[in-house]
Amino acid sequence: MWLYYLLKSMSWIISHLPYKLVVKIGLGLGRLYYIIAKKQRIRAEETIKERLGYSDEQAKATIRSLFIKLGATFMEIMYMPALNKNNIRGLVTFDRPDVLWEALGEGKGVVMLACHMDNWEWLGAALALSGFPLSAVEKPQPNHIYSDFMNELRKGVGQEIFSRGTSEILGCARAMKKKRMLGLIADQDGGYDGIFVPFL
């Protein structure tokens, strides 16, 4: 239980800092992580060289940038309690929100398929805080404390959350029946029963 309270305390402190400072700290953490996480760094570099045909230089530059941005993303996630309807518009921009409203207006519910790019947690937060009736499916973490903490952040900005491996199918069906927006992030291995699809 101490881990939960540690995460809550960190989030409380971070969410009371100026946003620009939060990002700067995150970028610094990302640079530090890139240096110390040698095993993960090498594995990531080898993967994109093999799968995407990157050169050594391209792979190193890409993974370094990724690690740095992940640091900022971590800090932004911890900052989520500070997000509200007033400040989210200055932090997240939607190109065509009218398209989503139009789709919801058809009264059939909307399935929104996204991927783990940029800050996917803020995407859900921005949708919910902008008034979209968002239900989302989350993949439980090996340590349930992380899942509980993350779901608390998600619910705090107005999302309805279903966990994979429970009764999420029923939850998704109910969300669609209520004409809600169902958010799915489906760019991960589906496991033993997963289906591989072409990518890039």
Model-found features: residue ranges?
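Soluble catalytic domains of membrane acyltransferases
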Residues: 81-200
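Membrane-anchoring hydrophobic helices of lipid-metabolizing enzymes
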Residues: 1-114, 149, 156-158
